[in-house]
A protein has these predicted regions:
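Pocket-forming structural segment of enzyme catalytic cores
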Residues: 108-207
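Short loop/helix-cap segments at secondary-structure boundaries that form the rim of catalytic
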Residues: 45-50, 105, 160-164
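Short, solvent-exposed loop/turn segments that connect beta-strands within catalytic domains
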Residues: 1, 87-91, 179-182
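Residues that mark the start of a beta-strand
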Residues: 2-4, 93, 146
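Cysteine-nucleophile active-site neighborhood
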Residues: 61-132
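Active-site metal-binding loops of divalent metal-dependent hydrolases
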Residues: 59-60, 101, 152, 202
Length: 268
């Protein structure tokens, strides 16, 4: 009997690379795992609790924007997943990415979600916290390790009392900027043994993104908005097997393999 995963698409119908890359990763586990795709924002599609694994994607726009019909059932699902894991032996395994990570942080009250002073676009180092150095999904990664980051919003001002009450831990922080006075954003949180989220995009496939970003029209648009030096650095980092490739190979595959192992043990 195959395990079941729900892929929650928060891209609101916009063209993106995140969902195809997540589907490609999930397809690798087709011998033990089947998955369904849910168009959360554009289609108001929300999975029920019959799934074993829930992968929440990134997406565009303001994570604090209200009024969408999908939002109440979306936050209701997060609450139900948390309560399920408190009450049941057979756990639900959850991964939040970027936009959904920001929404989860807002839902749990673990930090302040705000507009970033400047859009983050490209590849950057992030630094592990003490707990991040103990995080199994980051075991194969150096400190700092490199991530793909594309966002206009951030999570800062962590609520340490709330984190402690939940048993949650901040795993890594934005790169150090000694010449700037901005607070470093939270880049990953382990909410519980079964629930984790990252501000960055661990699904970023470096080979696929290289092809995508090197198309002339796209290259010209990026250089115009973000500058040639940032574009060149991103291309170098995507091509370097010790940078984005290591994160891509480690984080989501590690999450899925751990979830499959734990769920398979529960089924015995």
């Amino acid at each position: 009997m195959l395990l079941r995963a729900a892929l929650l698409d928060l891209y609101n119908g916009e063209s993106n690379r995140g969902i195809p890359m997540l589907k490609n990763i999930l397809d690798r586990y087709s011998d033990t795992l089947e998955f369904d795709h849910f168009d959360v924002r554009a289609g108001c599609e929300i999975p029920d609790l019959s799934y074993d694994i829930f992968v929440f994607s990134g997406g565009p726009g303001d994570p604090l924007e209200s009024g969408g019909k999908w939002q109440e059932p979306f936050f209701d699902l997060i609450g139900k997943l948390w309560q399920w894991n408190l009450r049941h032996e057979n756990k639900k395994h959850v991964f939040f990415i970027c936009h959904s990570f920001q929404m989860a942080c807002h839902h749990f009250g673990v930090g302040e979600v705000s507009h970033r002073y400047k859009m983050s676009f490209g590849t950057y180092p992030v630094h592990k916290t003490h707990q991040g150095k103990e995080e199994p999904l980051f075991n194969q990664l150096p400190d700092p390790f490199y991530i793909a980051d594309f966002r206009r919003y951030q999570v800062t001002k962590p609520n340490h009392d709330r984190l402690q009450a939940m048993g949650a831990h901040i795993l890594c922080l934005e790169k150090l900027r000694p010449h700037m006075h901005y607070e470093r954003a939270v880049m990953a949180i382990r909410f519980s043994p079964e629930m984790i989220g990252t501000q960055f995009h661990p699904e970023a496939d470096p080979e696929g993104l290289l092809t995508y970003f090197m198309e002339e029209e796209r290259r010209n648009a990026i250089v115009e908005e973000h500058g040639e030096s940032r574009y060149d650095r991103m291309i170098r980092d995507l091509a370097n097997p010790m940078k984005i490739r290591r994160t891509f190979d480690s984080v989501i595959p590690g999450f899925l393999e751990n979830a499959i192992e734990q769920l398979s043990m529960e089924m015995v």
